């Protein structure tokens, strides 16, 4: 079976010697639904950016579809055949939709990817209209993307990625800033995409989202290392792990003679321990 991603002892340091990833290793197989979990600053977004081939390891090795992803073999050769192959198979939905939107209309935004695949204009039109209908934004096709609401922008970004029909979807904090209805829509969409065999990797600290869209959790600590790589249910039920990685927190309350811990958890009601 093909290996989607193989990350081997990867570290990444930003300019100024700011360490973001520290000796990271894991593999991703086809059809997996994975959440990269961690508090703000743990490196999960950096890791997702690396998986999309936008940055390269400072140390270690990163392979996608059995090809090394590095500046020498991936970025330096602009007409690299594998580069085009990679971009066809991997789609990235950024946390900030405005970073991703650059076309003058929603239609053109969604059409941009298919146009790079040398499809005919008629084929592009068919593909775009199919995706717009699937996402439920056909009525927005002539709108300027930056006039849309946050939820509408997110839908356009997802439509633009899905227009290429990628095998792998990378999503950075996909539910951040969305209203409850749009969050539910997105979760249900990711569930359906998982059922048809898409490989879905999400970076998030929203534990409720993790529980609903992933089967595997990679938890990153504040030292930018992987703390745990395992089953989602097991991870979410590990209170000490969630506390130590700053994914939940607790404080003490006093009510008369009663003292109890107040545990704040993103994916469930507050838990009182007497």
Question: Which residues does each predicted region cover?
Answer:
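The feature captures the beta-strand-to-loop junction immediately N-terminal to the Walker
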Residues: 37-39
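Helix-to-loop junction immediately C-terminal to a conserved catalytic motif
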Residues: 52
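Conserved ABC transporter NBD signature motif
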Residues: 60-74
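Conserved ABC ATPase "signature" region
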Residues: 122-140
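Conserved ABC ATPase signature
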Residues: 144-148, 152
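ABC ATPase C-loop
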Residues: 161-162
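H-loop/switch region of ABC-family ATPase nucleotide-binding domains
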Residues: 204-205
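ABC ATPase nucleotide-binding domains
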Residues: 237-274
């Amino acid at each position: 079976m093909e290996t989607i991603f193989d990350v081997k002892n990867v570290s990444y340091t930003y300019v100024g010697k700011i360490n973001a990833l520290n000796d990271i290793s894991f593999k991703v197989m086809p059809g997996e639904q994975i959440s990269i979990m961690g508090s703000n600053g743990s490196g999960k977004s950096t890791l997702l950016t690396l998986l999309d081939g936008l940055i390269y390891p400072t140390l270690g090795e990163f392979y996608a579809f059995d090809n090394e992803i590095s500046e020498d073999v991936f970025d330096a050769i602009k007409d690299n055949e594998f580069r085009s192959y990679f971009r066809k198979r991997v789609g990235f939905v950024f946390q900030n939709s405005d970073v991703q939107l650059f076309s003058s209309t929603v239609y053109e935004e969604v059409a941009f990817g298919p146009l790079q695949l040398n499809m005919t204009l008629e084929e592009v039109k068919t593909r775009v209209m199919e995706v717009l209908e699937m996402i439920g934004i056909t009525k927005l096709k002539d709108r300027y993307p930056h006039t849309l609401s946050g939820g509408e922008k997110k839908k356009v970004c997802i439509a633009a990625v899905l227009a290429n029909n990628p095998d792998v979807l990378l999503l950075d904090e996909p539910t951040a800033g969305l209203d409850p209805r749009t969050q539910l829509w997105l979760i249900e969409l990711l569930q359906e995409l998982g059922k048809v065999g898409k490989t879905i990797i999400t970076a998030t600290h929203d534990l409720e989202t993790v529980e609903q869209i992933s089967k595997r959790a990679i938890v990153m600590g504040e030292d930018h290392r992987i703390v745990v790589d395992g089953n989602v249910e097991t991870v979410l039920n590990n209170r000490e792990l969630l506390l130590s990685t700053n994914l939940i927190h607790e404080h003490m309350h006093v009510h008369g003679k009663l003292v109890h811990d107040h545990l704040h958890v993103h994916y469930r009601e507050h838990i009182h321990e007497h």
